């Protein structure tokens, strides 16, 4: 498990990513001009899917707020995020 508190990033390709079975818990996060602030996915078949839980965040000027594969979970401010229409295309960006 990884816990992140009081993090910020400006002008970045990606923000916080959970992959291959990692569990990431973040709070008090600010991103500006981060293309993909949040992501969760399974890259290697021998590992599990990612879990990313973020509370109290602000993201501005992003391409897409999050990407995830079908089985990974992204929870932003207590709301479980569903796959968005650009997921498959955008996942290749963070691989």
Where are these regions (language model features)?
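Extracellular beta-rich repeat passengers
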Residues: 1-95
């Amino acid at each position: 498990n990884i816990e992140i508190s009081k993090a910020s990033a400006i002008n970045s390709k990606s923000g916080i990513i959970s992959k291959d079975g990692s569990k990431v818990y973040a709070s008090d996060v600010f991103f500006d001009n981060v293309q993909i602030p949040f992501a969760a996915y399974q890259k290697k078949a021998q590992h599990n899917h990612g879990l990313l839980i973020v509370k109290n965040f602000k993201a501005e000027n992003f391409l897409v707020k999050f990407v995830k594969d079908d089985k990974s979970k992204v929870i932003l401010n207590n709301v479980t995020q569903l796959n968005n229409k650009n997921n498959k295309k955008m996942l290749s960006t963070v691989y």
